Amino acid sequence: MKVLLTAINAKYIHSSLAIRYIYKNCQDLSCDIEMLEVSINNHLIDIANQIFDARPDILGISCYIWNIELVKQLLPLVHRLLPNCKIICGGPEVSYATKEFMQDFPMVDFVVRGEGEKAFHDLLQALLDDKNNEEIKIAGIAKRNSDDTIDENIAVTVSDLDEIISLPEEIVEQLK
Protein backbone atom coordinates (compact mmCIF):
# COMPACT_ATOMS: atom_id res chain seq x y z
CA MET A 1 0.00 0.00 0.00
CA LYS A 2 1.34 3.40 -0.98
CA VAL A 3 0.55 6.51 1.07
CA LEU A 4 1.22 10.06 -0.11
CA LEU A 5 1.24 12.78 2.56
CA THR A 6 0.65 16.11 0.84
CA ALA A 7 1.23 19.62 2.11
CA ILE A 8 0.29 22.69 0.12
CA ASN A 9 2.36 25.41 1.73
CA ALA A 10 1.82 29.17 1.56
CA LYS A 11 5.22 29.76 -0.01
CA TYR A 12 7.84 27.68 -1.74
CA ILE A 13 10.30 28.30 1.10
CA HIS A 14 7.92 26.93 3.75
CA SER A 15 8.08 23.35 5.00
CA SER A 16 5.35 21.35 6.68
CA LEU A 17 6.09 19.98 10.12
CA ALA A 18 2.69 18.26 10.13
CA ILE A 19 3.43 15.77 7.36
CA ARG A 20 6.88 15.13 8.78
CA TYR A 21 5.43 14.25 12.19
CA ILE A 22 2.79 12.01 10.57
CA TYR A 23 5.50 10.37 8.46
CA LYS A 24 7.77 9.80 11.45
CA ASN A 25 4.97 8.40 13.62
CA CYS A 26 3.89 5.91 10.92
CA GLN A 27 7.33 4.42 10.23
CA ASP A 28 6.48 1.19 12.05
CA LEU A 29 3.68 0.37 9.59
CA SER A 30 4.12 -1.95 6.61
CA CYS A 31 3.44 0.54 3.86
CA ASP A 32 5.34 2.83 1.53
CA ILE A 33 4.92 6.43 2.74
CA GLU A 34 6.06 9.39 0.67
CA MET A 35 5.76 13.14 1.19
CA LEU A 36 4.87 15.78 -1.38
CA GLU A 37 5.23 19.48 -0.69
CA VAL A 38 4.03 22.13 -3.09
CA SER A 39 2.88 25.71 -2.66
CA ILE A 40 -0.36 27.53 -3.31
CA ASN A 41 1.49 29.21 -6.17
CA ASN A 42 1.75 25.93 -8.07
CA HIS A 43 -0.88 25.37 -10.75
CA LEU A 44 -3.77 23.12 -9.78
CA ILE A 45 -3.16 20.78 -12.72
CA ASP A 46 0.53 20.48 -11.84
CA ILE A 47 -0.31 19.47 -8.27
CA ALA A 48 -2.89 16.96 -9.49
CA ASN A 49 -0.35 15.51 -11.93
CA GLN A 50 2.26 15.12 -9.20
CA ILE A 51 -0.26 13.26 -7.05
CA PHE A 52 -1.34 11.13 -10.03
CA ASP A 53 2.29 10.32 -10.90
CA ALA A 54 2.85 9.06 -7.34
CA ARG A 55 -0.13 6.66 -7.75
CA PRO A 56 -1.04 6.52 -4.04
CA ASP A 57 -3.57 4.10 -2.62
CA ILE A 58 -4.10 6.59 0.20
CA LEU A 59 -3.76 10.35 -0.08
CA GLY A 60 -3.40 12.50 3.03
CA ILE A 61 -3.83 16.26 2.63
CA SER A 62 -3.21 18.93 5.27
CA CYS A 63 -5.89 21.64 5.17
CA TYR A 64 -5.11 25.13 6.42
CA ILE A 65 -6.58 28.59 5.92
CA TRP A 66 -4.00 29.40 3.22
CA ASN A 67 -4.68 26.30 1.11
CA ILE A 68 -8.28 25.22 1.72
CA GLU A 69 -9.70 26.83 -1.44
CA LEU A 70 -7.05 25.11 -3.56
CA VAL A 71 -7.68 21.82 -1.74
CA LYS A 72 -11.41 22.13 -2.50
CA GLN A 73 -10.58 22.45 -6.21
CA LEU A 74 -8.03 19.65 -6.05
CA LEU A 75 -10.17 16.98 -4.37
CA PRO A 76 -12.64 16.33 -7.23
CA LEU A 77 -9.81 16.40 -9.76
CA VAL A 78 -7.73 13.86 -7.84
CA HIS A 79 -10.79 11.67 -7.38
CA ARG A 80 -11.38 11.66 -11.14
CA LEU A 81 -7.74 10.75 -11.78
CA LEU A 82 -7.48 8.17 -8.97
CA PRO A 83 -11.03 6.93 -8.27
CA ASN A 84 -9.90 4.07 -6.00
CA CYS A 85 -7.58 6.21 -3.87
CA LYS A 86 -8.74 6.72 -0.27
CA ILE A 87 -8.64 10.43 0.56
CA ILE A 88 -7.88 11.56 4.10
CA CYS A 89 -7.97 15.24 4.99
CA GLY A 90 -6.71 16.75 8.21
CA GLY A 91 -5.88 20.08 9.75
CA PRO A 92 -7.71 22.97 11.36
CA GLU A 93 -9.84 23.88 8.34
CA VAL A 94 -11.60 20.51 8.29
CA SER A 95 -11.70 19.81 12.02
CA TYR A 96 -14.52 22.14 13.08
CA ALA A 97 -17.27 21.66 10.43
CA THR A 98 -16.29 18.15 9.49
CA LYS A 99 -19.69 16.76 8.60
CA GLU A 100 -20.49 19.68 6.29
CA PHE A 101 -17.06 19.39 4.64
CA MET A 102 -17.55 15.67 4.02
CA GLN A 103 -21.06 16.28 2.67
CA ASP A 104 -19.70 18.91 0.27
CA PHE A 105 -16.83 16.65 -0.80
CA PRO A 106 -18.16 13.09 -1.08
CA MET A 107 -14.82 11.84 -2.38
CA VAL A 108 -13.27 12.37 1.08
CA ASP A 109 -13.28 9.08 2.97
CA PHE A 110 -11.88 10.24 6.32
CA VAL A 111 -11.07 13.43 8.20
CA VAL A 112 -8.51 13.55 10.99
CA ARG A 113 -9.82 15.90 13.66
CA GLY A 114 -7.38 17.47 16.10
CA GLU A 115 -3.88 16.15 16.60
CA GLY A 116 -3.15 13.66 13.87
CA GLU A 117 -0.02 11.72 14.71
CA LYS A 118 -1.71 8.88 16.61
CA ALA A 119 -5.11 9.05 14.90
CA PHE A 120 -3.58 8.90 11.40
CA HIS A 121 -1.31 6.04 12.47
CA ASP A 122 -4.24 4.07 13.86
CA LEU A 123 -6.32 4.75 10.74
CA LEU A 124 -3.52 3.55 8.46
CA GLN A 125 -3.15 0.42 10.57
CA ALA A 126 -6.89 -0.26 10.27
CA LEU A 127 -6.75 0.20 6.49
CA LEU A 128 -3.71 -2.08 6.27
CA ASP A 129 -5.72 -4.65 8.23
CA ASP A 130 -8.43 -4.40 5.51
CA LYS A 131 -11.06 -3.07 7.90
CA ASN A 132 -14.05 -1.53 6.18
CA ASN A 133 -15.20 1.92 7.17
CA GLU A 134 -17.96 0.61 9.43
CA GLU A 135 -15.41 -1.35 11.47
CA ILE A 136 -13.12 1.64 11.98
CA LYS A 137 -13.78 3.39 15.29
CA ILE A 138 -10.84 5.65 16.12
CA ALA A 139 -10.89 8.73 18.32
CA GLY A 140 -10.34 11.81 16.19
CA ILE A 141 -11.34 10.14 12.89
CA ALA A 142 -14.52 11.12 11.06
CA LYS A 143 -15.49 8.60 8.40
CA ARG A 144 -17.87 8.02 5.55
CA ASN A 145 -19.75 4.73 5.80
CA SER A 146 -20.77 2.57 2.83
CA ASP A 147 -24.33 3.94 3.05
CA ASP A 148 -22.86 7.48 2.81
CA THR A 149 -23.65 8.37 6.41
CA ILE A 150 -20.92 10.24 8.21
CA ASP A 151 -19.69 9.36 11.69
CA GLU A 152 -17.89 12.14 13.50
CA ASN A 153 -15.58 11.34 16.36
CA ILE A 154 -14.46 14.04 18.75
CA ALA A 155 -11.11 15.63 18.03
CA VAL A 156 -8.47 14.36 20.39
CA THR A 157 -5.56 15.99 22.13
CA VAL A 158 -2.51 14.08 23.17
CA SER A 159 -2.11 14.43 26.91
CA ASP A 160 1.26 12.68 27.05
CA LEU A 161 3.57 14.16 24.42
CA ASP A 162 6.02 11.32 25.02
CA GLU A 163 3.57 9.17 23.00
CA ILE A 164 4.50 11.18 19.90
CA ILE A 165 7.78 10.42 18.18
CA SER A 166 9.73 13.64 17.80
CA LEU A 167 11.57 14.66 14.69
CA PRO A 168 15.32 14.08 14.77
CA GLU A 169 17.36 17.22 15.40
CA GLU A 170 18.98 17.05 11.95
CA ILE A 171 15.56 17.36 10.29
CA VAL A 172 14.63 20.29 12.50
CA GLU A 173 17.95 21.95 11.69
CA GLN A 174 17.40 21.46 7.94
CA LEU A 175 14.09 23.28 8.20
CA LYS A 176 15.57 26.41 9.79
Q: What are these model-predicted stretches?
A:
Residues N9-K11, I65:
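Residue-level signal for short, function-critical loop segments
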Residues D162-K176:
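Radical SAM [4Fe-4S] cluster-binding motif and immediate context
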Residues K2, A18, N25-C26, D32-D160:
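Glycine-rich beta-alpha loop elements in corrinoid/cobalamin-binding modules
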Residues Y12-A18:
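Short N-terminal binding/cap micro-motifs at the start of the first secondary-structure element
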Residues K2-N9:
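Short beta-strand segments enriched in small/hydrophobic residues
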